[in-house]
Amino acid sequence: MKKSSKEISPSQSLKNGGSDHFFNTSLMYVLAACLASFIFGYQVSVLNTIKNFIVIEFGWCTGNKVECDDSTLKSSFLLASVFIGAVVGSGFSDYLVQHGRRFSLLVIYNFFILVSILTSITHHFHTILFSRLLSGFGVGLITVSVPMYISEMTHKDKKGAYGVLHQLFITFGILVAVLLGMAMGEAPDAKSVDALGEFQKIWWRLMFFFPCLISILGIVLLTFFYKEETPYYLFENGKIEESKKILKKIYGTDNVDEPLKAIKDAVEQNEAAKKNSISLMRAMQIPSYRNVILLGCILSGLQQFTGINVLVSNSNELYKEFLSNKLITTLSVIMTVVNFLMTFPAIYIVEKLGRKTLLLCGCAGVTLAAFLPTAIANQIDRSSDLVRNLSIAATFVMIISFAVSYGPVLWIYLHEMFPSEIKDSAASLASLVNWVCAIIVVFPSDIIIKKSPTILFFIFSGMSILSFLFIFFFIKETKGGEIGTSPYITMEERQKHMGKSAV
């Protein structure tokens, strides 16, 4: 059979940014979006190493017990404020992405320029709390906007691998935040009455300012180099030729009839749903739609109960129960390096093993890591060196298990499991649930850690077992699926309900 004149060879495809190679044209678009993912990770982790320095400079705890108890509460609010803001942001993200995926990223970058400046000049608890709430709002926008942009801007066979880059850049942001925090020196006790040095007074403010520079870079890239919207959004808004043009870049070939047809089908299904008024509220009244929405929300919420954000945002406080101040920051750095490096394998195995298998493996790893120190602590002295060493080792195994599975896979899965007519709103709802659960987990972590770290590990172990069983029995594989489709709802089922709603 003779080759079509529109088809090109693999070598030609590679020259044009071919889809058969990981480093291609669409990767550049994805990386421009992943700068927002970096800001996400940085904002979640930045307080981990500098929280006590802020407590000392603002004089929240000067030795008085009541005053210091109040300081602990203020610290808890600062830790949780990002997650509280993210709840609001993720709820608003559905509205934002409807105006364009690239547009939403530009809004996010401009927003973080303002927030970074505001946080860096704060001098009071209320202003820093407000600034952190705003940071959380921006993070909430990122949780939906970036995965959606990646999902719509990549080759069908690379959605998994490129989707992992979102989580990779989150872990990179976490790592950079901890590394910059090392410049502050040894982590002080929050009850210290010693004044901070001049460098320390300036540096923690510069750390809050740093995302401003990343945001400016993101704006430059999206304004001057990667100016196109996603092909799905372009097609949806009647710009078919522009959609075809960007698809040619993504697939590295002039023959984009198949992906264009997939987008056309998804857009038509979505338009039919809009015309027939199938909103999120309407979908919740239909059993098949309600089922997939609830599954997505439960899967998203359970991710937080594995305990990852306690390890990321409060590891210094956790390690303080086991180690001297000299080792705390060093160990936190090692943990974030491990978190960053172990995200790389997920890029290559997410398409080979599939989403469900990776999720199951990750939950099994977290369960074993969290259960072992808890079980031993119940048999011997909880304060023994063995329990302490096992607890520290468990945090590393938990981080590794999460980094190769639940961390990156969830955000890929949420944009593959929902049918196109509810994808935007359902993904936003699932993201909102994720952040609500993060607040529930992170806010009391300071108090629980001071009481007994083994209680935390017991909770994480139990929730990971529950997550494993939930995924095993209820979650379906989405690997290789077409954009806008869902393994939970057949096309016939969708058309039937859309037809009914029109009656």
Swiss-Prot record:
<feature type="binding site">
    <location>
        <position position="309"/>
    </location>
    <ligand>
        <name>beta-D-glucose</name>
    </ligand>
</feature>
<feature type="transmembrane region" description="Helical">
    <location>
        <begin position="392"/>
        <end position="412"/>
    </location>
</feature>
<feature type="transmembrane region" description="Helical">
    <location>
        <begin position="103"/>
        <end position="123"/>
    </location>
</feature>
<feature type="binding site">
    <location>
        <position position="303"/>
    </location>
    <ligand>
        <name>alpha-D-glucose</name>
    </ligand>
</feature>
<protein>
    <recommendedName>
        <fullName>Hexose transporter 1</fullName>
    </recommendedName>
</protein>
<comment type="similarity">
    <text>Belongs to the major facilitator superfamily. Sugar transporter (TC 2.A.1.1) family.</text>
</comment>
<keyword id="KW-1015">Disulfide bond</keyword>
<feature type="topological domain" description="Extracellular">
    <location>
        <begin position="378"/>
        <end position="391"/>
    </location>
</feature>
<feature type="transmembrane region" description="Helical">
    <location>
        <begin position="206"/>
        <end position="226"/>
    </location>
</feature>
<feature type="topological domain" description="Extracellular">
    <location>
        <begin position="185"/>
        <end position="205"/>
    </location>
</feature>
<keyword id="KW-1133">Transmembrane helix</keyword>
<dbReference type="InterPro" id="IPR003663">
    <property type="entry name" value="Sugar/inositol_transpt"/>
</dbReference>
<dbReference type="InterPro" id="IPR020846">
    <property type="entry name" value="MFS_dom"/>
</dbReference>
<keyword id="KW-0812">Transmembrane</keyword>
<feature type="topological domain" description="Cytoplasmic">
    <location>
        <begin position="227"/>
        <end position="291"/>
    </location>
</feature>
<feature type="transmembrane region" description="Helical">
    <location>
        <begin position="27"/>
        <end position="47"/>
    </location>
</feature>
<feature type="transmembrane region" description="Helical">
    <location>
        <begin position="133"/>
        <end position="153"/>
    </location>
</feature>
<feature type="topological domain" description="Extracellular">
    <location>
        <begin position="450"/>
        <end position="454"/>
    </location>
</feature>
<keyword id="KW-0472">Membrane</keyword>
<feature type="binding site">
    <location>
        <position position="309"/>
    </location>
    <ligand>
        <name>alpha-D-glucose</name>
    </ligand>
</feature>
<feature type="topological domain" description="Cytoplasmic">
    <location>
        <begin position="1"/>
        <end position="26"/>
    </location>
</feature>
<keyword id="KW-0813">Transport</keyword>
<feature type="binding site">
    <location>
        <position position="411"/>
    </location>
    <ligand>
        <name>alpha-D-glucose</name>
    </ligand>
</feature>
<feature type="topological domain" description="Extracellular">
    <location>
        <begin position="124"/>
        <end position="132"/>
    </location>
</feature>
<feature type="binding site">
    <location>
        <position position="167"/>
    </location>
    <ligand>
        <name>alpha-D-glucose</name>
    </ligand>
</feature>
<feature type="topological domain" description="Cytoplasmic">
    <location>
        <begin position="413"/>
        <end position="428"/>
    </location>
</feature>
<feature type="topological domain" description="Cytoplasmic">
    <location>
        <begin position="98"/>
        <end position="102"/>
    </location>
</feature>
<dbReference type="InterPro" id="IPR005828">
    <property type="entry name" value="MFS_sugar_transport-like"/>
</dbReference>
<feature type="transmembrane region" description="Helical">
    <location>
        <begin position="455"/>
        <end position="475"/>
    </location>
</feature>
<feature type="topological domain" description="Extracellular">
    <location>
        <begin position="48"/>
        <end position="76"/>
    </location>
</feature>
<feature type="transmembrane region" description="Helical">
    <location>
        <begin position="429"/>
        <end position="449"/>
    </location>
</feature>
<feature type="disulfide bond">
    <location>
        <begin position="61"/>
        <end position="68"/>
    </location>
</feature>
<dbReference type="InterPro" id="IPR036259">
    <property type="entry name" value="MFS_trans_sf"/>
</dbReference>
<feature type="transmembrane region" description="Helical">
    <location>
        <begin position="330"/>
        <end position="350"/>
    </location>
</feature>
<dbReference type="InterPro" id="IPR045263">
    <property type="entry name" value="GLUT"/>
</dbReference>
<feature type="transmembrane region" description="Helical">
    <location>
        <begin position="164"/>
        <end position="184"/>
    </location>
</feature>
<dbReference type="InterPro" id="IPR005829">
    <property type="entry name" value="Sugar_transporter_CS"/>
</dbReference>
<feature type="binding site">
    <location>
        <position position="339"/>
    </location>
    <ligand>
        <name>beta-D-glucose</name>
    </ligand>
</feature>
<feature type="topological domain" description="Cytoplasmic">
    <location>
        <begin position="476"/>
        <end position="503"/>
    </location>
</feature>
<feature type="binding site">
    <location>
        <position position="303"/>
    </location>
    <ligand>
        <name>beta-D-glucose</name>
    </ligand>
</feature>
<feature type="binding site">
    <location>
        <position position="167"/>
    </location>
    <ligand>
        <name>beta-D-glucose</name>
    </ligand>
</feature>
<keyword id="KW-0762">Sugar transport</keyword>
